[in-house]
Amino acid sequence: MARTDRDRWDLATSVGATATMVAAQRALSSDANLIDDPYAAPLVRAVGIDVYVRLVDGEIQPGTSEFDPHRMAKGMACRTRFYDDFFLDAARAGVGQAVILASGLDARAYRLPWPAGTVVYEVDMPDVIEFKTLTLADLGAQPTAQRRTVAIDLRDDWAAALREERFDTQAPAAWSAEGLLVYLPEQAQDALFDNITALSAPGSRLAFDFVPDTAVFADPRWRAHHDRMSELGFEVDFNDLVYHGERSHIVDHLSGRGCSLVPLFRVG
């Protein structure tokens, strides 16, 4: 089903299911030297999407496609490590606020060794925030930083909601928009970065990833992956979840607002 302007979801439906997919890929990572996320698999099981539960429980064998979930997990492990290092490098440099936009099943507030006094803000849909908070509490997990949740749709006035949770606009912050941008319409994407710029004190940092051309989700190789996941019982079509069409180039958008940008890598 195609997106609508005011659509909503939980972690088992629509865009929310992509957060569960990402958590499953983190759980599949076998290299403990790269990432360590002990909460990924329990969170996936708690959501209960059958195909991802079977994946993390080892009931689905690796395939040969480049989009096979097991192969994609290797890329997700690298992405996760990049953002882990981004936040910890910022924190060690004295940046005491971290803001995780569209936090999903991200457990960095619980699993990273944050310096004392660090405040981690998680911004996501109310149902997503509530589910993760309650599930991690049931697991006995304790945050390793001061965790503050902002339960709001990123298409709404999340900046005001963030300030209400005592975000300090006079202190630098580290921001992440991980795996997020393709799920926002053009206006919301531009507003997202304008808000980040307006809220950021000197010394703030921002990390994000983006897909230059969403036509990749209609590529025959990706469609083969979709068909394979459908065979396994997962019916969400990612081509229906992303916003297609022209939008501002993020690098140009931020450069025009005085940001210093460092491209780290490009895939494809």
Curated annotation (Swiss-Prot):
Q: List the disulfide bonds.
A: none
A Pfam family of the record is: LCM
Query: At which positions is S-adenosyl-L-methionine bound?
Result: 124, 153-154
Q: Which family does it belong to?
A: Belongs to the UPF0677 family.
Enzyme Commission number(s) of this protein? 2.1.1.-
Provide the top EC class. transferase
**What task does this protein carry out?**
Exhibits S-adenosyl-L-methionine-dependent methyltransferase activity.
Q: Which organism is it from?
A: Mycolicibacterium paratuberculosis (strain ATCC BAA-968 / K-10) (Mycobacterium paratuberculosis)
Q: What is this protein called?
A: Putative S-adenosyl-L-methionine-dependent methyltransferase MAP_0663
